[in-house]
Design a protein with these regions (language model features):
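HEAT/HEAT-like alpha-solenoid repeats
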Residues: 2-10, 43-50, 54, 85-92, ...
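Intrinsic low-complexity tandem-repeat regions in disordered proteins
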Residues: 64, 75, 106, 117, ...
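Alpha-helical solenoid repeat architecture
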Residues: 17-30, 44-47, 58-71, 89-90, ...
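Ankyrin-repeat and related helical/solenoid repeat scaffolds used for protein-protein interactions
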Residues: 333, 338-385, 417-455
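Universal eukaryotic N-terminal targeting presequences
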Residues: 1-2, 316
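N-terminal alpha-helical scaffolding segments that mark the starts
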Residues: 4-23
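Short, hydrophobic/charged alpha-helical patches characteristic of ARM/HEAT alpha-solenoid repeats
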Residues: 7, 14, 32-39, 56, ...
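Intrinsic disorder/low-complexity segments
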Residues: 5-8, 44, 76, 102, ...
């Protein structure tokens, strides 16, 4: 073939390469997106996905992924231009570089909303993505697992579709692979599946995920520990049986070490996992306490600030709620002080409310429990929060309930006395009723009461 004939074809190929690589480069910068969209870039990139030059196909897919990643409007444009079926078809036909780029587009579309994720599912992408989990190349597995995670995260129907496509068993295998990034992404995907319903969490358990996840609690990588603790908490939260599966994987006492981790999110996710187990049954709460979990949680709350404290605060409340011995274990572990600190010093009302609730759970069991709270000046602090005009309704309700729980058990007269002067009528009712119970049994308090004219 003569040079004169080949020249225009070579020039055309070079122009396509230059165009698609430049567009992919421009699509990395948000300030270019609107101009690219106005120039009709989607329609120009679409035929290049079927180009006979592999590098052009890959660059076209990469550019589309970057555009779709930018906004749901552009992701919608990918769907409306019927680009998804082409990508899905090519996923099973092309090389590993194209598969990564195609999975990136699917992920970039699916991440925005359930509607767009559903469009990805309807395009037949799930089977193709699941097949990619069996590829030899770890980076292809990573891209596919991330796309599946972005689909599953939205709702239980989409997560169920991922399960039905056979993804879970392969994701569990990916967790066992040596590549760190693949472990992280696979643990995240399993978490996104398990979080929705008991049945989906059971599907993850049935594929043997828990022992492999539990073994990674002690891994040195902080990001992996974050995702592992999160996944275990998403499994444990649903039922007693699922929580027991997590516990039987011998996460205690190893997960308590995560409460001291240098990474804030590892600490919070570990605390959340412990909370989800603690809330289930008395037996599980006792197991946590006997493993040193109460003391470790107290330390965690003491060393944390803001929303990171919440799972620890709730854990102490759940443990204390079950019975008097568990509540006493929280007291002995010096749990009152950090809960009181959260009640007084946290700026967010939902944290104060959680602390109030937990203090109420500690104090409701017996006069001895209530006395520990009274000696720490908790009742007057709860009253102050309750009477604060800026307090939310939920905070007022929980403070009032906690006060009632503590007052009705309190026989420590010095703690009740200030409440007589400060409490509004609806709280004063509980205080007076408690005095009526206490004074006949306490001669010294009765004498003081009479001599002072009623305090």
């Amino acid at each position: 073939m003569s040079r004169a004939v080949l020249a225009p074809f070579e020039a055309y190929q070079k122009a396509r390469v230059t165009f698609v690589q430049t567009v992919a480069e421009l699509a990395q910068r948000p300030q270019n997106i609107e101009a690219l969209q106005s120039a009709g870039v989607m329609a120009l990139l679409r035929p290049l996905l079927l180009d006979n030059v592999p590098s052009i196909q890959q660059s076209a897919a990469l550019a589309l992924g970057r555009l779709a990643n930018y906004s749901d409007e552009l992701a919608e444009a990918v769907v409306s231009n019927e680009i998804l079926p082409q990508l899905v078809y090519s996923l099973s036909e092309q090389n590993r570089f194209y598969k990564k780029a195609a999975a990136y587009v699917l992920r970039s579309v699916a991440k925005h909303s359930p509607h767009l994720a559903k469009a990805v599912v309807n395009s037949g992408a799930l089977d193709a993505l699941v097949n990619c989990l069996e590829e030899f190349d770890p980076s292809v597995k990573e891209a596919a697992a991330l796309a599946l995670s972005c689909i599953a995260k939205h709702n239980h129907e989409l997560a169920q579709a991922v399960v039905d496509a056979g993804a879970v068993g392969l994701l569990v295998l990916c967790v066992q692979e040596p590549e760190l990034t693949l472990k992280r992404i696979s643990a995240t995907a399993l978490s996104e599946i398990a979080k929705h319903t008991e049945e989906l969490a059971q599907a993850v358990v049935d594929q043997g995920a828990v022992p492999y996840l539990a073994a990674l609690i002690s891994h040195p990588d902080a990001q992996l520990k974050r995702y592992v603790c999160q996944c275990l908490s998403q499994i444990a939260k649903h039922t007693v049986d699922l929580a027991e599966v997590v516990v039987e994987a011998e996460i205690f006492p190893r997960i308590l070490n995560c409460l001291k981790d240098i990474d804030v999110q590892v600490r919070k996710n570990a605390a959340t996992c412990i909370r989800e187990i603690a809330k289930q049954t008395t037996e599980l709460a006792k197991l946590i306490v006997h493993s040193g979990g109460a003391a470790a949680t107290v330390d965690y709350i003491s060393e944390s600030k803001g929303n990171a404290r919440l799972p620890g605060i709730m854990t102490l409340g759940y443990i204390s709620a079950f019975d008097d011995s568990l509540a006493m274990a929280v007291i002995v572990s010096k749990g009152i002080a950090p809960l009181k600190d959260a009640l007084m010093n946290e700026p967010e009302d939902h944290l104060k409310a959680a602390a109030a609730w937990s203090l109420g759970q500690i104090g409701r069991h017996s006069p001895e429990h209530a006395k520990y709270l009274a000696e720490a000046d908790v009742p007057s602090r709860l009253l102050a929060v309750y009477m604060l005009q800026e307090s939310s309704k939920d905070l007022k309700d929980k403070s009032k309930k906690a006060l009632k729980n503590i007052i009705q058990m309190c026989t420590h007269v010095p703690a009740l006395e200030p409440l007589l002067q400060l409490a509004p009528n609806n709280i004063l009712t509980y205080v007076c009723a408690q005095f009526a119970k206490v004074l006949p049994q306490n001669l010294e308090a009765k004498r003081t009461f009479v001599q002072s004219g009623g305090f």
